[in-house]
Amino acid sequence: MKRKEADNWIMSYDKNNIFAKILRGEIPCKKIYEDEFVLAFYDVNPQKKIHALVIPKGEYVNLDDFASKASEKEIAGLIKGIGIVAKKLEVSEVVKGGGYRSLVNVGKNGGQEVVHLHFHIFGGEKVGKMVS
C-alpha cells in the first residue's frame, strides 16, 4: 500500500498477492468455474456453509479500480460469472437455491485484505444481517 494523505490509504496492485499466484497456477485452488474473464473457487477459510470467491483475471486492486479501468466486456464477464457461479453452487433463486449474498470489500475501511478485486459468494444457509 502507499500513503496518499494522513490516514487515507490507497492500495496499489501487488503482482505477488495470493490471487495473482492462484491465477498463475503457483498456488492451487478448488476451482468452481473459469472463463476468459473470471476464475471462481472455494474460499479456504469459509465463513458460511457455501463460501466462494469470484475474481477477475485482470490486475484490478478493487471495485473502484475495476470500474474505472476495465473494458465493457470484462465488466459484463464478471457480472455474468457471478451469476454462473451462483447457479453452479445451487444457491441462485433461478435453481431454487434459496438465495445468496454477493459481497465485495473495498479499501482499508471496507475490510479489504487482498489487493485483487474479489467477490465473495455466501449461501447454503441464511447469511444474516448485512452489517453488525
Each PLM stretch: what is its role?
Residues M1-S132:
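HIT superfamily nucleotide-processing domains
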